[in-house]
Amino acid sequence: MKKQLIIGTRSSPLALWQAEFTKAELSKHYPDMEITLKLVKTTGDVLLDSPLSKIGDMGLFTKDIEKHLLAREIDLAVHSLKDVPTSTPEGLIITSFTEREDTRDVIISKGGVKLKDLPPNARMATSSLRRMSQLLSVRPDLDIRDIRGNLNTRFQKFDDGEFDAMMLAYAGVYRLNFSDRISEILPHDMMLPAVGQGALGIETRVDDEQTREIVRILNHSTTEYCCRAERALLRHLQGGCQIPIGAYATFSNGTLKLLAFVGSVDGKTALRNEITKTGLTSPEQAEEAGIALAEELLKQGADAILSQIRKTC
């Protein structure tokens, strides 16, 4: 058994929370192990002037950490699973999916105003095409403004009056103790989350069996089934850039239910579908369900929506 572990992480407040959480959870099971953090600056932390939709977000927050992992400078990497591309580099694997936090998105607004009550043409900040598409489908008048930077930076921009409202993931807001700023938590029938939202993905080298065995103890089986189904759906649909896709799976007593959304950026076209599979006994079967739902969405016309978006990537 290893006596030391080095965790690779970004240096943003949320990333540090995630790494410290992982360290603390591992220490509960391995109290004598020395666990340290190595901070890595990623491309996504540096390129803050352009919208994610223009530069693409495939691995922007993970590739640089993965280089350290492949170079054996760290033993594991802790990511927000929603930032992890659905195909990991050769030699690396997502070994553990931590128990998921609430997957919903939230509205932060002046005076606690809810989405439906925001004034006409309100300035709404989000960097996500997924959120933009679903927002515009219910509030086509909104003036969508791009926002980048860590959570603290976004709250500062909001407090400085740059926007009337902004949309964030509940998980990050809760983890950094900003819950008292939430104006509204949006239900899944209005806003499906990003694939893997709310979960952490712990990445290791495939050939590092000792580390894989150590961190596997943090794996949450239900979360793994759900996230592997969602990631399989996204992998089957995606073509290498940020696109408006949302998904949310639940799993209980062998039954997986997966909801998914594909929409146009302007919110005028939205496809939703769902699938339920029973008797599942392996995460691989959950992935098969994700692929099956992706195929149904393609039959509905998702391919036409996605090909149009990819032309602008």
Curated annotation (Swiss-Prot):
Pfam assignment, any one:
Porphobil_deamC
Q: Which PROSITE patterns match?
A: PORPHOBILINOGEN_DEAM
Task: Give the EC number(s) listed in the UniProt record.
Answer: 2.5.1.61
Residues that bear S-(dipyrrolylmethanemethyl)cysteine: C241
Instruction: Please give the start and end residues of each transmembrane region.
Output: none
Q: Which GO molecular-function terms appear in the entry? A: hydroxymethylbilane synthase activity
Which biological process annotations from GO are given for this protein?
Answer: chlorophyll biosynthetic process; protoporphyrinogen IX biosynthetic process
Q: How does it assemble?
A: Monomer.
PANTHER family from the UniProt entry: PORPHOBILINOGEN DEAMINASE
What's this protein's function?
Answer: Tetrapolymerization of the monopyrrole PBG into the hydroxymethylbilane pre-uroporphyrinogen in several discrete steps.
Q: What's this protein's name?
A: Porphobilinogen deaminase
Top-level taxonomy: Bacteria, Pseudomonadati, Chlorobiota, Chlorobiia, Chlorobiales
Whichever gene encodes this chain, its name is hemC
